Amino acid sequence: SIIKLTASSTADSNRTVAHGLGVKPSFVLFRRTSNSAWFVWSAGLTTENNYLYLQDTYGVGALTQNANIWGNQSFTSQHISWRNSYTFSPNEELIAYVWADIDGYQKTGVYTGTGGALTVTTGFQPRFVMIKRTDSSGQWVMLDEPRGSGDNRLYADSNSEEHTGQGESFTSTGFRPRQTTTNDTNTSGGNYIYFAIA
């Protein structure tokens, strides 16, 4: 679901907007169109009011986690939410990209890094995967099949060129993070969220 709207003119108020999915979202990108800050929510984050920034490498603990970000309420099968004058300012133009898991097509999940061999099961062969470490800093790693079966990275938080030969791969039922101690996808004991699309 893609939602374009104008924030209410009422300051210091919790706001909601319908997303039309009929089920609770699993992954949300939300931003004002006049600013570079992308707020990210994932069902894989520790608590309902946690958030990350798509344009930065911060982990959850490096950001001031506050229930005001998402309007002091949980996302539901009907709406997403935010707080005017906290997350966004009154009368700003906003856009939200909202996804829900669909068996066999799309999945948001979590895994713990091993520093070695690891296979993450999604239940389908992905064509796109985005990965982010949440308990520490780490880049938003984007992998996709058209650019090389998951082996070539782009970073959502950076305008740097493609990084090739990184060692990730897709399987018929999921993906394999790089089999080293890289902080971005497979540090031993590291907590990661992912967003996969078939």
What are these regions (language model features)?
Residues 1-198:
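Surface-exposed molecular-recognition determinants
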